[in-house]
Amino acid sequence: MSSAPIGILGGTFDPIHYGHLAIAEEVRVALRLDRVLIIPAGEQPLKIGKHMAPPEHRLAMARLACADNPFFEVSSIEIDRPGPSYTHVTLQLLHDQGLENLYLILGADALADLPRWRETPRILTLARIVVVSRPGAAIDLPALAEMFPALPERLILIEGPRLDISSTDLRQRVAQGRPIRYQTPDAVVAYIEAHGLYR
């Protein structure tokens, strides 16, 4: 069993960008985490029906983006598992591997979606929730605490870096032939170009 504190940052990462990386680093330093697991989703339940780059490409881009940070580790735990990527299942699998001191990193928008997640009370027993607030994000904590009484004592709020970058915008820029350099690592830009993604 490992009591080392480990951050968990999941997402579609379609593509991963500097906003994701900055949030992971901000939380790692603020909470003195041993490392941060970057976990690309296989099939995200709340995004079923939306077109995504194939999982192997999203995983490869995440690995390229994280290659120069020894505290970031990219995991294929959700991509390797068939079916929807449910957070409570992923956290349980990590617990089963001996990782017991987990910090689930979310944006304020994802926190607002907690009522739509499966097994939210179970998630709160498996990990602390770290919310990185974004510019202008409003969090209705009283309403969430009413639904999930354990949330306030399991919640950590951190003000994150204000990088206004979105994967949706990057995909649109690529489709329009506009540059995405300086918004995602050069290795990711090169990978997108080499594989003709988002055209």
Swiss-Prot record:
Protein name per UniProt? Probable nicotinate-nucleotide adenylyltransferase
Q: Which residues cross the membrane?
A: none
The cross-references to InterPro entries, in alphabetical order and at most eight, read: Cyt_trans-like (IPR004821), NadD/NMNAT (IPR005248), Rossmann-like_a/b/a_fold (IPR014729)
What SUPFAM superfamilies has UniProt attached to this entry? Nucleotidylyl transferase (SSF52374)
- Name the top EC class: transferase
Listed EC numbers: 2.7.7.18
Q: Name one GO biological process term.
A: NAD biosynthetic process
